[in-house]
Amino acid sequence: MFNRLLKKINKVKSLEFDKATEELENFVYNNSNFLYILGEIGAIPESIEHDSTEEKLFSKVSDIVLSRAFIEIGLNSEVLKQRGNSADVFAESKFYGYSLVADAKSFRMSRTAKNQKDFKINSLNNWRGNSEYAILCNPYFQYPKKTSQIYSQSMNYNVCLFS
């Protein structure tokens, strides 16, 4: 299933970014094998060239997967179209009215020294707007293993760290 996703990314990479994103949303939202995609999305494959369109699309798919996960637990959710300086996912409770903004992160396994700025804790707090919650979703093995500013920042800014 994950290989089908990578082939889909390769197929749509020549489209305009918004159109490619729409194609990938359809692929993820309408896929009955969603759990296979969910299990693999956290690490950018080394076969994807650094700073390429495919890498940007893979990162966008991680946001699409997060949005689908929110839908699976009963929230209304969408991937936001705005690029740069905003959260990537918005979700809202159907029953309780609370809302949240979120960002999903994917890193290469070969990238060992992640900078605290890569996690954008402060930015997520600023992008919260009128939403009650801000969430960063990242595979547990990609979070820093030792002391890191992201943990104190997430506490100070009330940003939830999901894995």
Q: Residue spans of the language-model regions?
A:
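A short acidic/basic microdomain associated with nuclease active sites
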Residues: S67-V89
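Acidic/His-rich structured neighborhood in mature extracellular/periplasmic domains
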Residues: L100-R108
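Short, charged, amphipathic alpha-helix that recurs within catalytic cores of restriction-modification
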Residues: F107-S152
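Charged, structured surface patches that assemble and position nucleic-acid processing machinery
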Residues: I150-S163
